């Protein structure tokens, strides 16, 4: 089970201070803003076990008016708390710039850390080689490349995605990309 606390969805809105304006036990301090995510995680762990639960985070907070005044503190706290619960993994959507939080989140969590966000083969290999991630996740890249693992393994050309068709109803833009021969 992956608990989705990213991309401006409800748990992410509670976590980040740009959207959480509450004044009760679920607002204000980092601990309070993280409360709902941790309660949901604890409930999932109680049902499925820690080894079957992961959490998806969006430390960049750049979607749907999201943001946090101190993402290092907020997401560092969350990573540490999730680490105490010994869940299976955290997957973090984050940029590859100098100010990225991935290595700090991985260290605070202490478990399997999956890096995600516009990965390329080169970026993925580099993150894995230097130990900044235990695994990488490819999201949108799969939409235009249903045979992505094979293409990466063979250093084959990559289909150009058509972002205007992402999340469009019907098969066009999902199942009409050519596969390798």
Task: Give the ranges of each region predicted by the language model.
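Flavin-dependent oxidoreductase catalytic cores
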Residues: 1-181
């Amino acid at each position: 089970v992956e608990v989705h606390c990213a991309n401006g969805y409800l748990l992410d809105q509670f976590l980040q201070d740009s959207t959480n304006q509450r004044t009760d036990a679920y607002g204000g301090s980092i601990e309070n803003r993280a409360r709902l995510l941790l309660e949901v995680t604890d409930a999932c762990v109680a049902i499925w076990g820690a080894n079957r639960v992961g959490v998806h985070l969006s430390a960049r907070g750049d979607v749907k008016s999201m943001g946090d005044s101190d993402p290092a503190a907020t997401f560092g706290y969350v990573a540490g708390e999730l680490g105490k619960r010994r869940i299976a993994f955290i997957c973090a959507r984050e940029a590859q710039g100098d100010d990225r939080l991935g290595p700090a989140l991985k260290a605070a969590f202490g478990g399997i850390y999956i890096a995600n966000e516009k990965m390329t083969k080169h970026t993925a290999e580099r993150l894995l080689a230097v130990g900044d991630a235990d695994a990488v996740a490819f999201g949108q890249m799969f939409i235009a490349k249903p045979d992505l693992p094979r293409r990466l393994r063979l250093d084959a050309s990559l289909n150009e995605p058509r972002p205007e068709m992402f999340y469009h109803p019907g098969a066009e833009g999902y199942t009409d990309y050519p596969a390798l021969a």
